[in-house]
């Protein structure tokens, strides 16, 4: 949800103007995550000596768009933008309000005191902040914001002020602080007491570090440094030694930091580091990144990056690899489209091909999902499949449940992650649990993953983000390869998740003779799918015309059944998300159990009727709607002459195999939602109150 970006240049001279441009551009790359205010923190002096400037931190914060922050930056009269810094750390943040309304005081960076001794940017929610705040207030600390994050900044200062020895490291302070935090967080700290140093950490919220240098790096694998003795701080530290200032540095030794345990350029010291919530903010600067794990503390001191952990646990990986991103900058740019959402809708012919590339062999009718290959026999022996997700990803599970049940002959449950957790759903060792998330960081889905792992189930991730928490923590998985999706309303990720689950179903039954004809039928449908999607997209003008007739309405009902119930749910969600119209996806079989009361001549109704096993029942529902003076728009098969003849308004889509038809029927609804939002004057990519990556529960 919130966006974190920080930039540290070490012996790479940069003017303050260049530093600010880098920070602002980083925030712009994170805008798609959703936000309501933004801010930056940087060295504030105007001396020629960077160390003198680092003794003062300047904060600039603004409600609204990043563009408004950029304008505010250039209004600052006391900042010389042409001052050059040989070493500098700047931190920046886009805030999504969770505690306190959107305003400059509540925006990040949050500060420890009026002198800005410590500042911090934060993505997540601290659940015990009220207890921490109460303690700090009892010690005389005054709070100016309503945020949970300010508690973190003041907690660092409290630790620093009460540390008896003067040689405490920034890393040690942060380690002590995160021991007291409950909830989810990704944090980056800056301090006047530790000029040119950056410390970042995460727990339950993503954080990565990009590295850029003209010179060879010392290693491609950074070893983890562990504390050599147990800390004396307890689970609650008020009243402990830390409070009394007696917790000396010697009570908790730190593994040695030297040339064998750090990342740095070998030949020269010049290096740049980029801390970010996700890769889209760093890809234009570097493709070499380190993904932090929960409770990692990453520190840059004297241009050297080291990674620390407080304690060693079973299964810990001994280091963090420097990975190479395959993403390219042009993939996250709009190109000739007016919005990212429009671009992503029209990318679907290519994105479904990318999802299938190298996995589906149309010559010998085989499917090979490399990420599942080593576990497929175990999955085939399971007692049931559980698909766990939120929002659009949940709808992808609903859309493919029927074909999964048909081809695997296993019971398939599709669960909303939040409800799954609320019910303490029974999970067994012979269950296989799928976790579907575009970002791979969805908080409820991630909590569901950990819940299922504790109970011994095999876990499978289906994500669009390499290195995400879900992709790392699952036993195996499928990367959907849809490419970066920036628009908050998911489009191409939905169709790629759909195709990925169908491919999994095909892989599960490849050795069943009774299924071979059905497998071939579905695989031929997959082969034709990109061309059929292009055909649907060619109807854009027709759908735009329909939008001009509907955009002034306050509500719309979308009805269907069978394979298309999920299409109704997903279409209704898209309309809700970006047009702010009330919309409801209705199972046509439930029409007489309540929803029919809503139908009259004024209520816009969209029905999905395809030539599959539910055709006759859908026709019956259509007649019931018409009998109540409803005037439905019907999305139907272009070869369905009966429906076309008997219905005043139709959207005719090409025919495909029944279990893939939902991909072709959802695209008109994606286009309709887009055009409705544009006609109603709303920002399609950044709908109000919503975020792309929901990293808090």
Swiss-Prot record:
Q: Which residues form the active site?
A: 2 (for gatase activity)
List, in alphabetical order, the Gene Ontology terms for molecular function in this entry.
carbohydrate derivative binding; glutamine-fructose-6-phosphate transaminase (isomerizing) activity
Q: What induces it?
A: Expression in the liver oscillates in an ultradian manner (with a 12 hour period/cycle).
**Catalyses which reaction?**
D-fructose 6-phosphate + L-glutamine = D-glucosamine 6-phosphate + L-glutamate
Enumerate the spans annotated as SIS domain. 375-514, 546-687
| Residues covered by the Glutamine amidotransferase type-2 domain | 2-303
Give the E.C. number(s).
2.6.1.16
| Annotated substrate binding sites | 392-393, 437-439, 442, 593
Residues covered by region (Isomerase) = 311-678
Pathway(s) of this molecule: Nucleotide-sugar biosynthesis; UDP-N-acetyl-alpha-D-glucosamine biosynthesis; alpha-D-glucosamine 6-phosphate from D-fructose 6-phosphate: step 1/1
Q: What class of enzyme is it?
A: transferase
The PTM Phosphoserine maps to 259
Q: Does the keyword Transferase apply?
A: yes
Disulfide bonds, paired cysteine numbers: none
Record keywords: Aminotransferase, Biological rhythms, Glutamine amidotransferase, Phosphoprotein, Repeat, Transferase
Q: Which NCBIfam families match?
A: glmS (TIGR01135), PRK00331.1 (NF001484)
Quaternary structure, per UniProt, is: Homotetramer, may also exist as homodimers.
Its function, per the record, reads: Controls the flux of glucose into the hexosamine pathway. Most likely involved in regulating the availability of precursors for N- and O-linked glycosylation of proteins. Regulates the circadian expression of clock genes BMAL1 and CRY1. Has a role in fine tuning the metabolic fluctuations of cytosolic UDP-GlcNAc and its effects on hyaluronan synthesis that occur during tissue remodeling.
**Official protein name in the record:** Glutamine--fructose-6-phosphate aminotransferase [isomerizing] 1
Mind giving the lineage of the organism this protein is from? Eukaryota, Metazoa, Chordata, Craniata, Vertebrata
């Amino acid at each position: 949800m919130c966006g974190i970006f920080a930039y540290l240049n070490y012996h790479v001279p940069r003017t303050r103007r260049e530093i600010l441009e880098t920070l602002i551009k980083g925030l712009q790359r994170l805008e798609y995550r959703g936000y309501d205010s933004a801010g930056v923190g940087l060295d504030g002096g105007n001396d020629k000596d960077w160390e003198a400037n680092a003794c003062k931190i300047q904060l600039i914060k603004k409600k609204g768009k990043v563009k408004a922050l950029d304008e505010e930056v250039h209004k600052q009269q006391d900042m010389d933008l042409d001052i050059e810094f040989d070493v500098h750390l700047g931190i920046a943040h886009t805030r999504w309000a969770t505690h306190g309304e959107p305003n400059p005081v509540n925006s990040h960076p949050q500060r420890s005191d009026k002198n800005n001794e410590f500042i911090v940017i934060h993505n997540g929610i601290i659940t015990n902040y009220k207890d921490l705040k109460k303690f700090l207030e009892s010690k005389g600390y005054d709070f100016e914001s309503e945020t949970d994050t300010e508690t973190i900044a003041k907690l660092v200062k409290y630790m620093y002020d009460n540390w008896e020895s003067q040689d405490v490291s920034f890393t040690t302070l942060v380690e002590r602080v995160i021991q007291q935090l409950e909830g989810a967080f990704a944090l980056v700290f800056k301090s006047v007491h530790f000029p040119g140093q950056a410390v970042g950490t995460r727990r339950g919220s993503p954080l990565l570090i990009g590295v850029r240098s003209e010179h060879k790096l010392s290693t491609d694998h950074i070893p983890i440094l562990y504390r050599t003795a147990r800390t004396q701080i307890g689970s609650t530290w008020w009243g402990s030694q830390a409070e009394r200032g007696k917790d000396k540095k010697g009570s908790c030794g730190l593994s040695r930091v030297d040339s064998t345990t750090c990342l740095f350029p070998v030949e020269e010291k010049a290096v740049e580091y980029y801390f970010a919530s996700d890769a889209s903010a760093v890809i234009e600067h570097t493709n070499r990144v380190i993904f932090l794990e929960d409770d990692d503390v990453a520190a840059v001191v004297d241009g050297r990056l080291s990674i620390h952990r407080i304690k060693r646990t079973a299964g810990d990986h001994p280091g963090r690899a420097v990975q190479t991103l395959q993403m390219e900058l042009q993939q996250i740019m709009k190109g000739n489209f007016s919005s990212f959402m429009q671009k992503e809708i029209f990318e679907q012919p290519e994105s479904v091909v990318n999802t299938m590339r190298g996995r589906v062999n149309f010559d010998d009718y085989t499917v090979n999902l490399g990420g599942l290959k080593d576990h497929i026999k175990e999955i085939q022996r399971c007692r049931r499949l559980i698909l766990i997700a939120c929002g659009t990803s949940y709808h992808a599970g609903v859309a493919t449940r029927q074909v999964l049940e048909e081809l695997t002959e296993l019971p398939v449950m599709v669960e909303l992650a939040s409800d799954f957790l609320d019910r303490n759903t029974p999970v067994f060792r012979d269950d296989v649990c799928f976790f579907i998330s575009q970002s791979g960081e969805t908080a409820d889905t991630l909590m569901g993953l950990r819940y299922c792992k504790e109970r011994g189930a095999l876990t499978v991730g289906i994500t669009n983000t390499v290195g995400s928490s879900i992709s790392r923590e699952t036993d195996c998985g499928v990367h959907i390869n849809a490419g970066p999706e920036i628009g908050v309303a998911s489009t191409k990720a939905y169709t790629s998740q759909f195709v990925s689950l169908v491919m999994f179903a095909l892989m599960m039954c490849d050795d069943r003779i009774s299924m071979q004809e059905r497998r071939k039928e579905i695989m031929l449908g997959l082969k034709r799918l990109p061309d059929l999607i292009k055909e649907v997209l060619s109807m854009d003008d027709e759908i735009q015309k329909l939008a001009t007739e509907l955009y002034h309405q306050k509500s719309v009902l979308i009805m269907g059944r069978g394979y298309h119930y999920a299409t109704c749910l997903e279409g209704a969600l898209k309309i809700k998300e970006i047009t702010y119209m009330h919309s409801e996806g209705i199972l046509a079989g439930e029409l007489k159990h309540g929803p029919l009361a809503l139908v009259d001549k004024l209520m816009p109704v969209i029905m999905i009727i395809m030539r599959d096993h539910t055709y006759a029942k859908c026709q019956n529902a259509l007649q019931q709607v018409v009998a109540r003076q409803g005037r439905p728009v019907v999305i139907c098969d272009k070869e369905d002459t009966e429906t076309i003849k008997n219905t005043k308004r139709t959207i005719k889509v090409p025919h495909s195999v029944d279990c893939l038809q939902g991909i072709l029927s959802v695209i008109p609804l994606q286009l309709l939602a887009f055009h409705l939002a544009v006609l109603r004057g709303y920002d399609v990519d950044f709908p109000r109150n919503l975020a792309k990556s929901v990293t808090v529960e």
